[in-house]
Swiss-Prot record:
Belongs to the FapR family. GO terms for molecular function: DNA binding; DNA-binding transcription factor activity. GO terms for biological process: fatty acid biosynthetic process; negative regulation of DNA-templated transcription; negative regulation of fatty acid biosynthetic process. This is Transcription factor FapR. It comes from Bacillus licheniformis (strain ATCC 14580 / DSM 13 / JCM 2505 / CCUG 7422 / NBRC 12200 / NCIMB 9375 / NCTC 10341 / NRRL NRS-1264 / Gibson 46). Transcriptional factor involved in regulation of membrane lipid biosynthesis by repressing genes involved in fatty acid and phospholipid metabolism. Disulfide bonds: none annotated. Keywords: DNA-binding, Fatty acid biosynthesis, Fatty acid metabolism, Lipid biosynthesis, Lipid metabolism, Repressor, Transcription, Transcription regulation.
Length: 188
């Protein structure tokens, strides 16, 4: 038996609250209605689409994790983080990131993505870049997506130093690599 619109919308809200990563297709199947009906219900209830719900959940969990800088100061979007171990961020190269004459990304944006990821990775409220050895291996163009992967390769809390290796890729092709020596407070 089909539920009334009001009942369906109440159940839809409950379902999305308990399982925020459920797709519109799965919801349509669960409630035996069309995908368009689910989308209209979400719109009426001001429930964001799946991608926005995922982003919101990720931001909430990362806000509690990142200690060394506010999330809005990270260049790119952190999608994975394990403090003092590894992290991944994504940066969409848009018009504001490139030279207008050739649409090639300015190097400082790639450096900033890698450096801010290295800072965010540190499990300490104080994290500063002491030294960086970087290499740009190919040009990045407007419209490309840069995925930066950082991992801690050496951790010395007694000396207050952490070495972080960051490699950035566009479609699995290396575009940037760097080794960052990070200063951290000795009390963490």
């Amino acid at each position: 038996m089909r539920k009334s619109k009001r009942e369906r919308q109440e159940l839809l809200q409950q379902t999305i609250r308990t399982t925020p990563f459920i797709t519109d297709e799965e919801l349509a199947e669960k409630f035996n209605v069309s995908i368009q009906t689910i989308r209209l219900d979400r719109l009426e209830l001001s429930i964001p689409e799946l991608r926005e719900r995922i982003k919101s959940v990720a931001e909430k969990s990362l806000e509690d994790e990142v200690k060394s800088l506010p999330l809005d100061e990270v260049i790119g979007e952190i999608i994975d983080l394990e403090l003092d171990e590894h992290a991944i961020s994504i940066l969409e190269i848009r018009r504001e990131h490139v030279f207008s004459r050739n649409q090639i990304a300015r190097g400082h944006h790639l450096f900033a993505q890698a450096n801010s990821l290295a800072v965010a990775l540190i499990d300490d409220e104080l994290a500063l870049t002491a030294k960086a050895d970087i290499r740009f291996t190919r040009q990045v163009k407007q419209g490309e997506r840069v995925v930066a992967k950082a991992k801690v390769v050496k951790l010395d809390k007694d000396k207050g130093r952490t070495v972080v290796e960051v490699n950035s890729y566009v479609a699995e092709e290396p575009v940037f690599s760097g080794e960052f020596v990070m200063y951290r407070s000795k009390q963490s």
